[in-house]
Amino acid sequence: MKFQYLLAIFMIVLVVTDHCQAFIGMIPGLIGGLISAIKGRRRRQLEARYEPQQRNFRKREIDFEKLFANMPDY
């Protein structure tokens, strides 16, 4: 075989193995996500993550209102 063909085959094999490794690496995460979705844990985790951010946002909003209330009008 010519060197060009060997290089092309090597590149194709390299790309295919890279994609296979990425897919194999995703499998445990997909299985864990599927199990947690079946058990209903994922929804609770997302709600727990969202609520503190919402509280912090409200606190920041109140702080800004106080700051702007004390500023003079021009």
Swiss-Prot record:
Cell compartment(s), UniProt: Secreted; Target cell membrane
GO cellular component annotations of the record: extracellular region; membrane; other organism cell membrane
Tissue and organ distribution: Expressed by the venom gland.
Keyword Membrane: yes
An example Gene Ontology biological process: killing of cells of another organism
Miscellaneous comment as given in the Swiss-Prot or TrEMBL entry: Fragments comprising residues 4-17 and 5-17 have been detected in venom but it is unclear whether they have a physiological role or are simply due to degradation.
Identification of the protein by name: Peptide Im-4
Origin species: Isometrus maculatus
